[in-house]
Amino acid sequence: MKRIGILTSGGDAPGMNAAIRAVVRKSIFDGIEVYGINYGFAGLVAGDIRRLDVADVGDKIQRGGTFLYSARYPEFATEEGQLKGIEQLKKFGIEGLVVIGGDGSYHGAMALTKRGFPAVGIPGTIDNDIPGTDFTIGFDTAINTVLESIDRIRDTATSHVRTFVIEVMGRNAGDIALWSGVAGGADEIIIPEHDFDMKNVAKRIQEGRDRGKKHCLIILAEGVMGGNEFADKLSEYGDFHTRVSILGHVVRGGSPSARDRVLASKFGSYAVELLKEGKGGLCIGMLDNQVVAADIIDTLENNKHKPDLSLYELNHEISF
């Protein structure tokens, strides 16, 4: 394989630049040319493609976001969009593609695979909701960003003896809420993957107040409901001096953590190895601290991401 293309798609995640850097440098080290595709699959179809050199990825490993930019492009789900994309890849002489992104990006890579074009998926999303890997690029940075906010909010919550509902991103997955909640000593963690009873939540808050507790922190995954809606429902069971903090897109930004930089570097290098060996139609992951590759079609069609619910039970046992 003489030429590899790379794109980032969907929501950005800290560490994407580190992955791009690894792909570019590993490729050049192995004598392979790399072409960067701007704006994801939209840029692919439009032919917004340029050659990348070592200098292009210098001073990038510490930066959040993606310097190749990203975009959502639902048209790539159509036959016309896919064929146009393959036409552009062939026009530039690109023989294999690295796709960094989340679930939608993986489906784009899978579509190319089904049409006979070798593509390798790298999991890059703060949501940590991709099957076939324990952790995705950007997740560690995201939970540390949330954790910093939890620590700050606790200060003001204690000063005013308040309950705070902290809404965090994650789409339909509760991993960000779960991990940051345990690390931040949350009183309650509300996630889509586990039922909850508002009456019991209110009961636990009141029990804490009765023991003299000066704050209550509830970490709410956005996939359950909005923070303001949750606070309104909670108020039906008592006045807990509740305030709502919606962290939103701030969780996506910032310099990637050491863990995300290392993870991204490992994934990027391995993606090049796979394509160099002529292997496409795969997605890369980290399972039991080992970098692995699995069939992307099988992974998407027959697997479903599951959070570590033992953390939910742990928090319930130690959060009173």
UniProtKB/Swiss-Prot annotation:
Regulation: Allosterically activated by ADP and other diphosphonucleosides, and allosterically inhibited by phosphoenolpyruvate.
Pathway the protein contributes to: Carbohydrate degradation; glycolysis; D-glyceraldehyde 3-phosphate and glycerone phosphate from D-glucose: step 3/4
Binding site for Mg(2+): 103
Keyword annotations of the record: Allosteric enzyme, ATP-binding, Cytoplasm, Glycolysis, Kinase, Magnesium, Metal-binding, Nucleotide-binding, Transferase
Catalytic activity, as annotated: beta-D-fructose 6-phosphate + ATP = beta-D-fructose 1,6-bisphosphate + ADP + H(+)
Gene3D superfamilies: 3.40.50.450, Phosphofructokinase domain (3.40.50.460)
Enzyme Commission no: 2.7.1.11
Residue positions binding substrate: 125-127, 162, 169-171, 222, 243, 249-252
Positions annotated to bind ADP: 21-25, 154, 185-187, 211, 213-215
Gene Ontology MF terms in the entry: 6-phosphofructokinase activity; AMP binding; ATP binding; fructose-6-phosphate binding; identical protein binding; metal ion binding; monosaccharide binding
NCBIfam families membership: PFKA_ATP, PRK03202.1
Function: Catalyzes the phosphorylation of D-fructose 6-phosphate to fructose 1,6-bisphosphate by ATP, the first committing step of glycolysis.
Record's subunit section: Homotetramer.
Protein's recorded name: ATP-dependent 6-phosphofructokinase
Native source organism of the sequence: Enterococcus faecalis (strain ATCC 700802 / V583)
